[in-house]
Amino acid sequence: MKVLVLNGSPKAERSNTLNITKAFLKGFPADTEVEQVNLYKKDIKPCLGCFSCWSRTPGQCVIKDDMQDIYEKIKAADIVIESFPLYFFGMPSQMKATTDRCLPFMLPYMGNLVEDKNASFHELRDESMHEKRLVVITTCGYVDEKPMYPALLKQLDLIAGEGHYTAILCPEGELFIADKAKRQREGYLAEITRAGAEFAQNRALSEETKKLSLIHISEPTRLQLIS
């Protein structure tokens, strides 16, 4: 099994989100091939909106930068994990640029509305891409994930199709840098490792496991931990 981690945090290895991602991967079999790409250390230019990947050079982006190598890594992976903190209700800029540059994987929009809400807005160019699994692991500083993630999840629904990706949403991200929160942090990461083992076996998470992957601490306790 090959796993590609696209680390979209500008903190690179110091990313709090990456700690969760590594805990998730700890649940995978020992022989899993894991490759990590720190996007902020790569030369990834923004999409030009030229649509050459849909017309003049179908399936091929005309921009020659590090995305050409990332395309090949995505094609070779069985599972792609996007790991990033929530920035202004969405992806950090380098993660968004990478997402924009994945347009060559999609077929052109031909003016037909998608009736199936579980389908992506654009059809994938290569049928083999349907066999891959996408996992999105993301943190935010707010105490509740519900008001923070609707915009991001709607975008992912349109890109990948509702139910065609696995999202692990982690609010209260500041607990990962609070000295007093070690016990809560370790307990949460243990749950994430168990979730990783389940995903590695089933390529999906049960609804119960999704709930356990959320960290919620009461307001008085949270204030004590971060003070």
Predicted regions and their residues:
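N-terminal beta1-alpha1 ligand-phosphate binding loop
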Residues: 2-29, 143
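N-terminal beta-loop-helix "entrance" segment that forms/cooperates
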Residues: 39-58, 176-182
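Single conserved hydrophobic/aromatic residue that forms the stacking wall/gate
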Residues: 215-227
